[in-house]
Amino acid sequence: MLWRTTNIFPKRLCFGSQCNMLCRTTFALARLPGLIGRWFDERLALMRKGILGIAAVSVALLTSLTACGDDNKDSGGGGAKIGVILPDSKTSARWETADRKYLRAAFDAAGIKADIQNAQGDKNAFQTIADQMITNGASVLMITNLDSGTGKAVIQKAKSQGVTVIDYDRLTLGGGAPFYVSFDNVKVGKLMGDGLAKCLTDKKAVNPIVAYLNGGPTDNNATLFKNGYDGVLKPKFDSGEYAKGPDQAVPEWDNTKAGTIFEQMLTGTPNLGGVVAANDGLGNAAIAVLKKQKLNGQIPVTGQDATVQGLQNVLAGDQCMTVYKAIKLEADAGAKLAIALARGEKGEANSTVDDPEANAKVPAVLLEPKAIFKENVNDVVADGYVTKAELCTGEFAKLCADNGVR
């Protein structure tokens, strides 16, 4: 009689194509409780073992169906999912060594399921990853675009599916993302300009010719960095205190291309007095060229990102300074905003930035960068961004000790 009075079949059984056959079979059984009940009544005496066997199968069916339905459920996240797309591993080591690590820790601490992937500089892969994340149920995407065109395509697709997008570190011009999380990138550039001026003053340089080795031409951050350092150095060019030298962007922030470009700069202007390199990778490319001419340490070179390589170049005196951007703070801020939006809460910004292509102000969470010279390299180590063990290897052990790296 159990089969006449008890409905063991749930109302909602299937979630996904892999369950289709199982679901059709189970629903067919669910529609015939009376028939099943009569069948078992007539054969109750003979089929007790059979009933137990079918009951066991029913439990197995229900367990399998439950697993199908819970594939996308987040622990502690109210069902929300967050997708993060990092740009590459080539333009800077930070994306894999810092951003991924800190973002993962922040999401795990909040109990939010997040999918963090890297497009490895491939525009098609970037779009494919975004499509997969949306299909898999992400309610928030946090992207670091490869260029504004790639970013816009993802943002438009996400909007059409009701998915919120956060621009992380790089603003997608004309994209219309409702939030942007980054450092004050104009200030990053200003610190580079001020840093080069300090280094040239320390060297007592007279009318130095200054070259610009700018970042990728399609990266809005590269534009902001240049706005910052040009704001410091242009008045010096205009007054005649400094002379403006070669000025060239490096496609896709490619360090190999940067080396070639700078070699051509140095060949055409052998009396260069200083170099604004837009990050540590480009700076190291310039330093490698200068080493060939035994000019390293004589011509100040800037950078930013406070990479291990950049900090070692600073300690060695080959790079005059770098800019430390506390990536953990940026990752934590991005994760906090993404989690709030995924939970249906209102996101909070502390500033706005201009999107000249959209002629709009974008709500932003902006963080403060810090200039790093030889004397305060330890600040980066003390903050945990790099370790003494990875920085102070081989020949750099003594340089670390001499400069107070603990």
Predicted segments with their positions:
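Extreme N-terminal basic, low-complexity initiation segments
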Residues: 2-9, 13-14
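Sec-dependent bacterial lipoprotein signal peptides
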Residues: 23, 27-66
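A residue-level marker of the well-folded mature domains of exported/periplasmic proteins
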Residues: 4, 17, 36-43, 49-51, ...
